[in-house]
UniProtKB/Swiss-Prot annotation:
Classification via NCBIfam families: PRK00278.2-4 (NF001377)
InterPro entries per UniProt: Aldolase_TIM, Indole-3-glycerol_P_synth, Indole-3-glycerol_P_synth_dom, Indole-3-GlycerolPSynthase_CS, RibuloseP-bd_barrel
Keyword set, alphabetical order: Amino-acid biosynthesis, Aromatic amino acid biosynthesis, Decarboxylase, Lyase, Tryptophan biosynthesis
Protein name: Indole-3-glycerol phosphate synthase
Record flagged with keyword Amino-acid biosynthesis: yes
Organism: Chlorobium luteolum (strain DSM 273 / BCRC 81028 / 2530) (Pelodictyon luteolum)
Amino acid sequence: MTYLAKILKEKRREVAAIKAERPLARYLELRSSLAPARGFQEALRGEDGRLRLIAEVKKASPSRGVIVHDFDPVRIALHYEEIGASALSVLTDRQFFQGSPDYLRAVSAAVRLPVLRKDFIVDESQIFESRLMGADAILLIVAALEPRQLRDYLQTASETGLDVLVEVHDRRELDTAAEEGATMIGVNNRNLKDFSVDPATSSDLRPFFPPDTIAVSESGLKTAGDIAHLRDAGFHAVLIGEGLQTSKELTGLTWPVSHSLS
């Protein structure tokens, strides 16, 4: 069984508990009192040609184990805000990434930046749950959904005020994302079947993005050279988690990154 299959199997078990909390009913009851979502997609849409940073608050991963032992999500998020991130991503998956919805709630309340809920969405109830916990955007993974699900979930997210980053890994998934109406697409350089990483995946797929789509590169970015390559390839933003914890090159850059990489 692949990594992704294992994760999705667990997520489908979790959905039963989520539905027991009646997130749709709670959303309908509370929506008039919810703060407007901060524009995640708009934060990445610059006309200046600079590459923007989505900084990920990440404690662990299935491939690396614990990355940050002294994990304080709010402290990390505030640091990312200080270094010039345009948006944040927070892992909420418990079993495989040691994340938590509580981390997202705390980060969303502490920062001004828009926040993406990074998790594996397999049911509509998780979308309402995301809005209630303070997310401004969600991730939808093409490999985890049927095309009709993707289309329906994009519509539901829009109706609740959430932006959507649609994640792809190959040309077929990119075409599916475009056909179902995605306006912000992220290329995951990590293959979710075996967790191998190939940074060239993003640049290989970039020419096939629909016009006016926000293009994001995710995973495996470690050096200033990686960043320069993606900027030159025409990406609007990069999503970086582990690299910001391990690479002084990346934290030393002035974000958003200009043509001079200074």
